[in-house]
Amino acid sequence: MWGYLSLMPVFLAVWAISGVWIVFAIAVTNRTVDLSKGFPYISICGSFPPQSCIFSQVLNMGAALAAWICIVRYHQLRDWGVRRWPNQLILWTGLLCALGTSVVGNFQEKNQRPTHLAGAFLAFILGNVYFWLQLLLWRLKRLPQPGAAWIGPLRLGLCSVCTILIVAMIVLHACSLRSVSAACEWVVAMLLFALFGLLAVDFSALESCTLCVQPWPSLSPPPASPISLPVQL
């Protein structure tokens, strides 16, 4: 039985993948990118209006969803007995990935290139590290794996391809092979969105989540007076 929490990763994957390709289609249609000169980076497609507005909205909402998914995943791993420090390391890696995604969307390359590249580093590199850490934890701790037996190997394959393509993207860009490097960037983005989408399988084991407010002890209300209840023996 799949609960509503399992829909969040699926929605994130569908939203982000369709959103960036819509931005690409608009950029090609209004000729802000010219395919005859080479295949563009995602950031180039989202640098010019009107698609830059859509690009920002897509990545901002995607970042918010990714952050919430990382928080839910943190609590799931905690309930599975994962210790605090590795769990928090995974959580903060995911949150920084979400932050980088928002930075990429709001600081376009043509306006704030250094800030944009810093956001891209957080989104791509730490996004990949986020899933590698979970794979390592799953391997060492023998954590539960909801879903089919091939989910784990599939994640391993996607993370491996993602790592190879990130390295290739950087090397090809340094060698001025921009079109091939851009193609690698697109594939990496799709793989990361797919990896987030696969968390739907893990969340299928969750029925719901509850937000609890924990006040400081000094601000807690005084305990209620004890009440004696008659007991008949």
From Swiss-Prot:
Q: Subcellular location, in the record's words?
A: Cell membrane; Endosome membrane; Cytoplasmic vesicle, Autophagosome membrane
Q: Where are the transmembrane segments?
A: 8-28, 52-72, 85-105, 117-137, 156-176, 186-206
The stretches that face the Extracellular side, renumbered to this chain, are 29-51, 106-116, 177-185
The residues exposed to the Cytoplasmic compartment are 1-7, 73-84, 138-155, 207-233
Q: A GO BP term, please?
A: autophagy
**Tissue/organ expression:** Highly expressed in the colon and lung with comparatively high levels also detectable in the lymph nodes, placenta, duodenum, peripheral blood mononuclear cells and spleen.
Q: What induces it?
A: Is not markedly up- or down-regulated by DNA damage, nutrient deprivation or by exposure to TNF-alpha and IFN-gamma.
Pfam families this protein is in?
A: Frag1 (PF10277)
Protein's membrane topology: Multi-pass membrane protein
- Per the record, the major location class is membrane
Q: Which UniProt keywords apply?
A: Autophagy, Cell membrane, Cytoplasmic vesicle, Endosome, Glycoprotein, Membrane, Transmembrane, Transmembrane helix
Q: Which family does it belong to?
A: Belongs to the DRAM/TMEM150 family.
Q: What does this protein do?
A: Modulator of macroautophagy that causes accumulation of autophagosomes under basal conditions and enhances autophagic flux. Represses cell death and promotes long-term clonogenic survival of cells grown in the absence of glucose in a macroautophagy-independent manner. May have some role in extracellular matrix engulfment or growth factor receptor recycling, both of which can modulate cell survival.
Name listed for the protein in its UniProt record: Modulator of macroautophagy TMEM150B
Q: Which gene encodes it?
A: TMEM150B
